[in-house]
Amino acid sequence: MKKLLFATCCIAFLSASLGAAAQKKSVAKNVLTQTLNGKSWSADNGNGTFTNPLFYDEFSDPDIIRVGEDYYLAGTTMHSVPGLVILHSKDLVNWEFSSYCFDRFDDSDDFNLRNGKEAYGQGIWAPAIRYHNGKFYIFSNINGHGLQVYISDSAKGPWTHHKVNGDIYDLSVLFDEDGKIYAVHKYGNVTVTELKPDLSGPVEGSSKVVIPEGNAMGEGHHVYKINGMYYILSADYSPMGRMQCARSKSIWGPYETCVISERESYGYAAGWSVGNMGIGRPLPEDGFSFQNNKPNGLNLGCATIHQGGIVQAPDGKWWGVSMLDFNAVGRTVCLSPITWVDGWPYFGLEKNLGRSPRTWFKPNDMVKTPQAPYDRCDDFSGKTFKPVWQWNHNPNDKMWSLNKERKGWLRLHSMPAKQLLWAKNTLTQRAIGPVSYTSVKLDASRLKVGDEAGLGTINTPYASLGVVKTDKGLNLRCYDQNTNKEVWKPLAK
């Protein structure tokens, strides 16, 4: 599912004002950053139970599989690179990083923040992860570049990839028992298409709308074959985020449908929204007047769990993963017990079907010590970035260095930018809820007049806290794009 707003991130950035760039013709400035220690959220309560969400940060469009005793989870990464993240778990609660499927997007203006183009809220999204005949497959769409498939012998990579032809998007994939491969895809009109064995594209003439629009099956499909029945899970948004399930004895239908989860927000309310921003609109200039909409207490919107998939544990029990929108943190992943009633996989427990417990018993006790998927602290002494880091759009690799130009430091060279959202080589982490604290050690001694370096949150509106070099020296600048207010404070020499 494509996001209307991009996720909030914690960032380190460096930019030069356009005015300074125009005056100097060249801006090859340096900034040095180094992080300090911090902590991260874990869903494991340490007593045999867990509390949702699994990750208190953005991880949207989750899709899950099990291979033996190992679980694998794939999620959307949009415009951030490296992209298409895969996590691994033994108990569905404690997760660790496995790999990214690719390092960067192909060269283009939008993915490079070049010539006034950008890819916020675009990029790669809604992955489908599958395991078949000893290989892992990840199917996902890149805006403007169509459907891609990434293939590896291991979830740790390396991954090879090629484009899959055809008008196929927001899909799930089924490797059927008879050797045929099916894609369930599109929004509204749920469509089934048979894929060629080499995954080069669709079998000609095979596409069929199996559930017409208006039958409460929306998007973000997940397809399974269970005990001879075909099941399709979808996210629907009328009147608010919920999960639907369709089933049939044939992949081609006819299908009957059932609501399997609705109105489950774990007590959270819908957050504030911006009414005059979204996909397809220009990025807001500083001074833009944002239309901030107060949430409607009667409509939870997407603050309820909606899109996700299901998986069977080795002990025969079933579990579901889904996402819910949690204010500026983004879309968080939740784990639910699945209760089968009359052949339908309901999220939740018996006598309370469709409503998932926020705290529940872990699927197993294979992991004794609670752990978070990422180590979020970095002293930049390694040869590569820790996997928690992603670039905002493609980086310019000539304008940064890690532990090379200065040992134990990340060095960012400034490039012209109108404001934070256009700053290239911005290094990001997803913001952690419910509250985040970030510390950074920054050497600003080599900033030139017009340069700015620091931290910020990437969203619309954005906010930043940075050190600015003027002809009078260094200043601390705090800017809130929502209110268009800024505070300047001179720094002591």
Annotate each PLM feature:
Residues 1-25:
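Bacterial Sec-dependent N-terminal signal peptides
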Residues 23-493:
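Carbohydrate-active catalytic/glycan-binding domains of CAZyme proteins
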